[in-house]
Amino acid sequence: MPQLDTSTWSITIVSMIITLFIMFQLKLSKYSYPSSPELKLTKTPTHTTPWESKWTKTYLPLSLPQQS
């Protein structure tokens, strides 16, 4: 069985990493970021649900002893 020649693997891996780094740098350089970020006021919508206006009784779990 012939031996696998791995002498070119290192240059292939290094060139691939450099190429990926350059591509990511080019991709990230296309974004424009604001010079001074400002807070954006967001209004949270209020949802009314039927159970919010009703009174509900909270019961103790059955495992706890009764308090008198």
From Swiss-Prot:
Places the protein is found: Mitochondrion membrane
Entry's family note: Belongs to the ATPase protein 8 family.
Protein keywords: Acetylation, ATP synthesis, CF(0), Hydrogen ion transport, Ion transport, Membrane, Mitochondrion, Transmembrane, Transmembrane helix, Transport
Name of this chain's protein: ATP synthase F(0) complex subunit 8
GO molecular function terms attached to this record: proton transmembrane transporter activity
Complex and partners: Component of the ATP synthase complex composed at least of ATP5F1A/subunit alpha, ATP5F1B/subunit beta, ATP5MC1/subunit c (homooctomer), MT-ATP6/subunit a, MT-ATP8/subunit 8, ATP5ME/subunit e, ATP5MF/subunit f, ATP5MG/subunit g, ATP5MK/subunit k, ATP5MJ/subunit j, ATP5F1C/subunit gamma, ATP5F1D/subunit delta, ATP5F1E/subunit epsilon, ATP5PF/subunit F6, ATP5PB/subunit b, ATP5PD/subunit d, ATP5PO/subunit OSCP.
Its membrane topology: Single-pass membrane protein
Pfam family for this entry, one: ATP-synt_8
Modification sites for N6-acetyllysine: 54, 57
Function: Subunit 8, of the mitochondrial membrane ATP synthase complex (F(1)F(0) ATP synthase or Complex V) that produces ATP from ADP in the presence of a proton gradient across the membrane which is generated by electron transport complexes of the respiratory chain. ATP synthase complex consist of a soluble F(1) head domain - the catalytic core - and a membrane F(1) domain - the membrane proton channel. These two domains are linked by a central stalk rotating inside the F(1) region and a stationary peripheral stalk.
TM regions (residue ranges): 8-24
Keyword hit for Amino-acid biosynthesis: no
